[in-house]
UniProtKB/Swiss-Prot annotation:
Source organism phylogeny: Bacteria, Pseudomonadati, Pseudomonadota, Gammaproteobacteria, Enterobacterales
Gene Ontology biological process: CDP-diacylglycerol catabolic process; phospholipid biosynthetic process
Stored Pfam families: CDH (PF02611)
Main location: membrane
Originating gene: cdh
Organism encoding this protein: Cronobacter sakazakii (strain ATCC BAA-894)
Membrane-crossing residue ranges in chain numbering: 5-27
Protein name: CDP-diacylglycerol pyrophosphatase
Length: 255
């Protein structure tokens, strides 16, 4: 009887999640919209007229663009200048590929420029969603504010976060995450995608199932967070869930 109940609950969970995924695919936004903006507008404008619009920045030598997202007053996206679909791309594990997370952290300055006053680093976070957890098929890192409750959890767990991957104490937004402390120096020279693929067992073979997030800690280091798709736990590996595009932290004062 107990086994039958567990099977029934599992089937209901799978059905609910399948319905959610099907809805996303049956009623999608254009999954190539970001790629069209980058390839058909930002890059030609920069090359022909030195005008990156609608992007805020096009850095051809470094291989990235920065675009203001339509959601939230301060959210920006960092994207490559060539075709990379997302976190599952083998290109992200090549030594020849730029360190997009480090570039995105440098690009946080656009948040302050848009706001007209400094956005403290403690309010900033970076995320990239998994293959199933995203709506766009052009690689993009979300540069946006951190949720206040997530900021509080990171502060409380700071001393428990080590330099090796380990489960984050408790959960974040109801989902399990791995956490790893990263220094600024390490972040500048080593891609978080490499850290995940080389240090978490079997991650290299299943990169598309993972979502990554990065946020600063109070002691000057960073915490790198990773969550893996778990359908029975309603987790699509959408670490953007840790962000608050309305930036309540800034309304509450300097975090």
């Amino acid at each position: 009887m107990k086994r039958a109940l567990l099977i029934t609950v599992a089937l209901i969970a799978v059905l609910a999640l399948t319905t959610l995924v099907a809805w996303r695919y049956l009623f999608p936004h254009d999954p190539d919209a970001l790629r069209h903006i980058v390839m058909q507008q930002c890059l030609p404008g920069e090359r022909e007229r030195q005008e990156p619009a609608p992007c805020a920045q096009v850095n051809l030598p470094a291989g990235y663009v920065v675009l203001k997202d339509i959601n939230g007053p301060l959210q920006y996206l960092l994207m490559p200048t060539w075709k990379i679909n997302g976190v599952e791309s083998p290109l992200l594990l090549s030594d020849n590929t730029p360190n997009f997370f480090w570039q995105a952290w440098q690009a946080r300055r656009w948040m302050s420029e848009k706001r007209g006053s400094p956005v403290p680093d403690s309010a900033v976070s970076l995320t990239i969603n998994s293959r199933m957890g995203r709506s766009q098929n052009h690689f993009h890192i979300h540069i946006s504010c951190l949720r206040p409750d997530v900021r509080a959890q990171l502060d409380a767990a700071m001393n428990a976060i080590g330099s090796r991957w380990q489960p984050f104490p408790g959960s974040l937004r109801g989902h399990d995450y791995l956490a790893r402390r990263v220094s600024g120096e390490e972040l500048s020279r080593r891609s978080p995608f490499m850290m995940l693929a080389e240090e978490v067992p079997q991650a290299r073979e299943h990169m598309g199932r993972y979502s990554l997030a990065l946020a600063p800690l109070k002691d000057g280091a960073f915490v790198l967070l990773a969550t893996q798709r778990q359908l029975l736990q309603f987790n699509l590996a959408h670490s953007e869930e840790l962000q608050d595009h309305d930036c309540a932290l800034l309304h509450e004062g300097t975090p």
